[in-house]
């Protein structure tokens, strides 16, 4: 839709008036010129780096702001959304229609009378279920970010484009009435599912737009029987699809970027009758400690049209990827075609036959790989476990566990069991097997090597794990292989990595207790009760 008169009317219907000029679906050339032009100040200013990519700063918010996330409570959402509660806290806090109206007025006022960038794009590679998304912003690099991250429409698709969801990004405005309205702060990321609008105020972080639309796909798709997943995905030469679930830092992007297989996508996917499809048209990779040696694909993708966030740019234009002084969450967004080995022309493939859950276990308890039963698949999917090592004041490094339902609780709009049901149903239809892979630590105190982890992934994907002789691990009742090609056999049973097996037993009992306690939130239903048997025995 390039009729600017009609577009101006549609902006008017959102309360955005007296627009000076609309820059509609700008080209990469124009975006580059706009975000680096002389006279830009503060967080609007982009800096050109020696790799050709533009670097920007997002201010005090260098990550999402989950405490400021709200969804309007109305007839449509009251019985569908997984609302936060005293018993089980989550990020889906209810907002009244009155408060919403006030915030929408604030953002509309901020965007009125300005020169605006409007980007029309798609979220979802399948025509039947994709969301047509319109992003309205006054900031050039935010238009660049969504051009990278969403699916870029053809000229034909832009004719008669009607948005299903509008993102009104008012990063420069804050809410003075937040206290009286009972909100968390002057900043806000709010959704009105009935109106099909997302409002952003006070935060410049690009990921709010990406993950905002992910949360909306997570609302609409499962209600239609389609799995909506926080995972990466790739496909082999024989058309065999694999999906990798995991929280941040567990290896989703690294392990799915594999020279032997084509990348479907690195973060958000759906699974319908036809198969697995990407929601996005780009990647959003972490860049802390990035090197050309360790991650050549991602490093090579950082060139003209890529957009770096919160990195340190030296005076000579080089980027110091080891410098996390602004944030450890330094990022780059780039169009997916910056990666060589991708599925073309549309990021989708057949139904998955291998489902891999990645956990980085800092407790040193979980085996490097276990094959899961259907009940265990549901249990460990709902648990969504990983653990980080955090230094304490006395220099002792203690593991801190994270349980995030479906490996992405922050983005779930419906109750976690709805995602588990749809995933298991899809797996049953395709005959998919599930595996739990620990990319974390063992009894040696060292992290399992990337070489061994890649060997394990290869064994899962080429089917050799299914031919391996299996043993059993007590407490968790995991089925574990005794040997795999190219993998150090001494690590496959975690008990063998301890000088004293009783030490593993003690740690395993502790971790099992944490799993059991976390799973109590699901035991309110008969199905949840039944799944307890698939979990560890503390």
UniProtKB/Swiss-Prot annotation:
Which EC number(s) are documented for this chain? Answer: 4.1.1.49
Cofactors, names only: Mn(2+)
Q: What is this protein called?
A: Phosphoenolpyruvate carboxykinase (ATP)
Tell me the Gene Ontology biological-process terms attached to this UniProt entry: gluconeogenesis
Reply yes or no: does the keyword Lyase apply.
yes
Q: Say which enzyme class the record assigns.
A: lyase
Q: Which HAMAP family does the record cross-reference, listed alphabetically?
A: PEPCK_ATP
Q: Which reaction does it catalyse?
A: oxaloacetate + ATP = phosphoenolpyruvate + ADP + CO2
State the superkingdom.
Bacteria
Source organism (scientific name) = Mannheimia succiniciproducens (strain KCTC 0769BP / MBEL55E)
Where in or outside the cell?
Answer: Cytoplasm
Q: What is the role of this chain?
A: Involved in the gluconeogenesis. Catalyzes the conversion of oxaloacetate (OAA) to phosphoenolpyruvate (PEP) through direct phosphoryl transfer between the nucleoside triphosphate and OAA.
**Molecular function terms, GO-annotated:** ATP binding; metal ion binding; phosphoenolpyruvate carboxykinase (ATP) activity
Q: Which SUPFAM superfamilies match?
A: PEP carboxykinase N-terminal domain (SSF68923), PEP carboxykinase-like (SSF53795)
Q: Which UniProt keywords apply?
A: ATP-binding, Cytoplasm, Decarboxylase, Gluconeogenesis, Lyase, Manganese, Metal-binding, Nucleotide-binding
Q: Which residues bind substrate?
A: 64, 205, 211, 331
- Residue positions binding Mn(2+): 211, 230, 267
Give a Gene Ontology cellular component term annotated to this protein.
cytosol
Q: Tell me the subunit arrangement.
A: Monomer.
User: What is the cofactor note?
Assistant: Binds 1 Mn(2+) ion per subunit.
Q: Encoded by which gene?
A: pckA
Similarity comment text for this entry: Belongs to the phosphoenolpyruvate carboxykinase (ATP) family.
CDD domains documented for this protein: PEPCK_ATP (cd00484)
Residue intervals passing through the bilayer? none
Q: Name one Pfam family in it.
A: PEPCK_ATP
Q: Which residues bind ATP?
A: 211, 230, 246-254, 295, 331, 447-448, 453
Question: Which pathway does this chain act in?
Answer: Carbohydrate biosynthesis; gluconeogenesis
